[in-house]
């Protein structure tokens, strides 16, 4: 719902400012580029407005929706939360993605164990994730490595934000422990319980 509201406001801003907001299959590459550039300007403007209006829940919902790359809404929003010491909002923004990546990894681990009984952790650690993702083949071990890398990247980014915001030491240690057990693949579903914060 928030994504729809956000997109409508971007479209309205583009129209109000005489910028292109709709394209056709017949558009030239230049027209398409101009429209996409205008759309990005509109996104930045509406993001700025919503942040000024403190529409944080709606922006977090947009970030969680996955419609935009992280650098479009997620990262500017996280940086705003850090700069303004909005710890609860930062938690709500960041924990969900981490939790979902870990849950996807755990689900794939469960499937792998049902087929093979033992999990080859060393093989998973040695998988070149970018090459695996670029390829066309599917394997449980490749998927586990992909979700593990995604979760670790998200956790590392989150730790950086937490250090900047001077998060409570106990909570920061919990996140660092989560990083360790994701890295060594010893994590269990119950380990995610502290990471279900909601505003």
What are these regions (language model features)?
Residues 50, 54, 101-104, 162, ...:
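Alpha-helical junction/boundary sensor with strong preference for TPR arrays
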Residues 1-67, 198:
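N-terminal alpha-helical interaction modules that lie
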Residues 43, 74, 94, 120, ...:
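TPR repeat positional signature
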Residues 32-40, 67-75, 101, 134-136:
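Generic helix N-cap/helix-start motif at coil->alpha-helix transitions
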Residues 47, 78-79, 98, 114-117, ...:
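Conserved small-residue packing positions in alpha-helical repeats and bundles
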């Amino acid at each position: 719902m928030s994504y729809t509201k956000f997109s409508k406001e971007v479209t309205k801003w583009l129209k109000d400012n005489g910028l292109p907001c709709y394209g056709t299959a017949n558009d030239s590459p230049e027209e398409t580029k101009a429209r996409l550039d205008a759309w990005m300007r509109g996104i930045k403007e509406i993001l700025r407005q919503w942040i000024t209006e403190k529409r944080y829940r709606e922006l977090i919902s947009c970030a969680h929706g996955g419609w935009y790359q992280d650098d479009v809404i997620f990262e500017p929003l996280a940086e705003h939360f850090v700069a303004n010491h909005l710890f609860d909002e930062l938690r709500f923004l960041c924990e969900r993605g981490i939790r979902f990546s870990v849950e996807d990894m755990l689900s794939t681990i469960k499937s792998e164990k049902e087929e093979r009984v033992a999990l080859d952790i060393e093989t998973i650690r040695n998988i070149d994730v970018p090459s695996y993702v670029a390829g066309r083949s599917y394997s449980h071990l490749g998927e586990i490595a992909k979700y593990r890398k995604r979760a670790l990247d998200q956790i590392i980014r989150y730790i950086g934000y937490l250090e900047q915001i001077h998060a409570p030491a106990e909570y920061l240690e919990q996140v660092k422990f989560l990083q360790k057990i994701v890295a060594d693949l010893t994590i269990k579903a119950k380990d995610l319980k502290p990471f279900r914060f909601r505003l």
